[in-house]
């Protein structure tokens, strides 16, 4: 088990210890469930009531919250960021054993860096390049001409089609499929003609892609996911989409083809973005927002209808259907009221 003293954590986080700096911390936990040897945090005022009753050995607090706290604390600028850093330091996620499992199938032309780990029944195709310390989980398939940067991890049962490039320090979770064909067809007299998807996928450094998400290859040119992007579970990224640096996309969101999303955007869960649109840097979409036009200015955008009692929703649905009629009636009334007698 990993462990660290509060003094060492204060140096890591540029914080100040309030209490015993020799206290040893071995893991992180919530205020409600923490026990001795664990450190917790307060980043949301909704949980302030749990602060006095917590059994945590220490708590990450802002300077303001630390003033009224009698227990041991590590005072930092941002308790949530501090929690993330400590959680990384004490992370106990198991790492794959270095080496190649006997059941793995590796093409002779593949180039493997030092320290790679390849699990049972994994398949590595022709001309694949794996950087140093790459971890390939059991049952994962890497198609030909793929490149995977150093320290990237693919968990079990990930599929990379051909011509997919992953940067360094990426994490791809189980069930993710990268490089499948985009939804490209032409219609000739009622019949669909498949358009070969001849591009690839280019993914930058420090990208994380959640379980069962799908990233389509480009039709012509590449689908691009830039450095620092985080994508949640069950997200669909279509052909030729471009996602800017450090953008976050929450679960069940769907992007149609040829969408360009800027840097530092936050896309809430269950959003839908129509094709061939551009979204500016710094846009934040709240959950279940439907985007049908370009967004050229940063800011928070929403379109979802919030939950309400069914009887109220049914009445409002009827009223919504009557909006055009009501508008025309108001327009007529305004016109008549402005007509001289």
From Swiss-Prot:
Biological process annotations from GO: lipid A biosynthetic process
Keywords: Acyltransferase, Lipid A biosynthesis, Lipid biosynthesis, Lipid metabolism, Repeat, Transferase
Subunit structure: Homotrimer.
Annotated organism of origin: Shewanella sp. (strain MR-7)
One GO CC annotation: membrane
Function summary: Catalyzes the N-acylation of UDP-3-O-acylglucosamine using 3-hydroxyacyl-ACP as the acyl donor. Is involved in the biosynthesis of lipid A, a phosphorylated glycolipid that anchors the lipopolysaccharide to the outer membrane of the cell.
Keyword Transferase found: yes
Pfam families the record matches: Hexapep (PF00132), Hexapep_2 (PF14602), LpxD (PF04613)
Entry-linked PROSITE patterns: HEXAPEP_TRANSFERASES
Family: Belongs to the transferase hexapeptide repeat family. LpxD subfamily.
Record HAMAP family: LpxD
Enzyme Commission number(s) of this protein: 2.3.1.191
Pathway: Bacterial outer membrane biogenesis; LPS lipid A biosynthesis
Active site (record annotation): 239
Sample GO molecular function, one term: N-acyltransferase activity
InterPro entries in the cross-refs: Hexapep, LpxD, Trimer_LpxA-like_sf, UDP_GlcNAc_AcTrfase_non-rep
Protein's UniProt name: UDP-3-O-acylglucosamine N-acyltransferase
Superkingdom per UniProt: Bacteria
Catalytic activity, reaction form: a UDP-3-O-[(3R)-3-hydroxyacyl]-alpha-D-glucosamine + a (3R)-hydroxyacyl-[ACP] = a UDP-2-N,3-O-bis[(3R)-3-hydroxyacyl]-alpha-D-glucosamine + holo-[ACP] + H(+)
Underlying gene: lpxD
Keyword Lipid metabolism: yes
């Amino acid at each position: 088990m990993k462990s660290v003293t509060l003094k060492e954590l204060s140096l890591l986080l540029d914080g100040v210890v309030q209490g015993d700096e020799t206290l040893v911390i071995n893991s992180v936990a919530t205020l409600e469930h923490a026990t001795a040897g664990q450190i917790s945090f307060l980043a949301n005022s909704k949980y302030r009531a749990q602060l006095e009753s917590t059994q945590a050995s220490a708590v990450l607090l802002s300077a303001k919250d630390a003033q009224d706290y009698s227990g041991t604390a590590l005072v930092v600028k941002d308790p949530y960021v501090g929690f993330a850093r400590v959680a990384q330091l004490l992370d106990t996620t198991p790492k794959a054993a270095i080496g190649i499992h006997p059941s793995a199938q590796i093409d002779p032309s593949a180039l493997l860096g030092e320290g790679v780990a390849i699990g049972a029944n994994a398949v590595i195709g022709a001309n694949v390049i794996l950087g140093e310390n790459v971890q390939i989980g059991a049952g994962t398939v890497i198609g030909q001409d793929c490149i995977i940067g150093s320290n990237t991890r693919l968990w079990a049962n990930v599929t990379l089609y051909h011509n997919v490039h992953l940067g360094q320090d990426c994490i791809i979770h189980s069930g993710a499929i990268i490089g499948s064909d985009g939804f490209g067809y032409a219609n000739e007299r009622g019949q669909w003609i498949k358009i070969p998807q001849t591009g690839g996928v280019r993914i930058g450094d420090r990208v994380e892609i959640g379980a069962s998400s799908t990233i389509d290859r480009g039709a012509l040119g590449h689908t691009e996911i830039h450095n620092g992007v985080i994508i949640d579970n069950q997200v669909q990224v279509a052909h030729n989409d471009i996602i800017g640096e450090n953008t976050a996309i929450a679960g069940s969101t769907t992007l149609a083809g040829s969408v360009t999303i800027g840097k530092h955007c936050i896309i809430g869960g269950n959003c839908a973005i129509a094709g061939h649109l551009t979204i500016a840097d710094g846009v934040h979409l709240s959950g279940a927002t439907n985007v049908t036009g370009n967004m050229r200015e940063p800011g928070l955008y929403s379109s979802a209808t919030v939950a309400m009692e069914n009887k109220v929703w049914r009445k409002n649905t009827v009223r919504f259907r009557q909006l055009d009629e009501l508008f025309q009636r108001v327009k007529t009334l305004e016109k008549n009221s402005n007509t001289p007698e």
